[in-house]
Amino acid sequence: RLFQEIREKRGLAYSVYAYAQQFAGTGVLGFYAGCNPTKSVEVVEIIQEVLSDVVQNGLTVEEIDRAKGAVRGSLVLSQEDTGSRMSRIGKSEIVYGEIMSFDDILKSIARVTPDEVRAVASEFLIKSPTLAVVGPHKDLRKFEKVLRNGGSK
């Protein structure tokens, strides 16, 4: 949804993506947009608006199915690389205290429901965001205002 809104619909960024990293007891859910510095505040506003919409309205079944397919595809491709397989197995042991089989991971992905996505979104997407800005920005007050207002202008 972020890619569609920021890159495809508005043409404001060169690259837009989301990523997640899980660790024992904590993690990171991040969003990245590489854009012209003159558009960066607008891009942050749009990210906040999209995240707020996900919290309020959830994702469609189609969006969730697309995301599941992307995660499954990425996981399957990662199995071709020995280093990726070792990393997945080690991370599983450290984070979950057990090694989850490839099939169990695929089954877990398949079980994700719209209600679960919305619950996680409500818990994590708009509370206490942290923003890293790289570029020629001397005055960060506009960014701080966007974060305080949750994307609403």
Summary of predicted features, one role per range:
Residues 112-120:
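A short, acidic, amphipathic alpha-helical segment used as a generic capping/interface helix at domain edges
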Residues 3-56, 61-111, 127-135:
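M16 family metallopeptidases and their MPP-like homologs
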